[in-house]
Amino acid sequence: MDIEQLREKSADELKAHLTDLRKEQFSLRMQQVTGQLPKTHETRRVRREIARVKHLLGSTK
């Protein structure tokens, strides 16, 4: 999801999206540890999207 789509969301929606992203990050990390992660770039994508959401949450306060 790009930054423009994230800016359109409310703070509650961003918090829910952040929770989903953290769950996805945990799942990807577990797959990586067990050697079952074929697309290693996904961890980077999720980490960056978490940073985008946290940035928007901090700037809306």
Curated annotation (Swiss-Prot):
<dbReference type="InterPro" id="IPR036049">
    <property type="entry name" value="Ribosomal_uL29_sf"/>
</dbReference>
<dbReference type="Pfam" id="PF00831">
    <property type="entry name" value="Ribosomal_L29"/>
</dbReference>
<dbReference type="GO" id="GO:0006412">
    <property type="term" value="P:translation"/>
</dbReference>
<keyword id="KW-0689">Ribosomal protein</keyword>
<comment type="similarity">
    <text>Belongs to the universal ribosomal protein uL29 family.</text>
</comment>
<protein>
    <recommendedName>
        <fullName>Large ribosomal subunit protein uL29</fullName>
    </recommendedName>
</protein>
<dbReference type="InterPro" id="IPR050063">
    <property type="entry name" value="Ribosomal_protein_uL29"/>
</dbReference>
<dbReference type="GO" id="GO:0003735">
    <property type="term" value="F:structural constituent of ribosome"/>
</dbReference>
<keyword id="KW-0687">Ribonucleoprotein</keyword>
<dbReference type="InterPro" id="IPR001854">
    <property type="entry name" value="Ribosomal_uL29"/>
</dbReference>
<dbReference type="GO" id="GO:0022625">
    <property type="term" value="C:cytosolic large ribosomal subunit"/>
</dbReference>
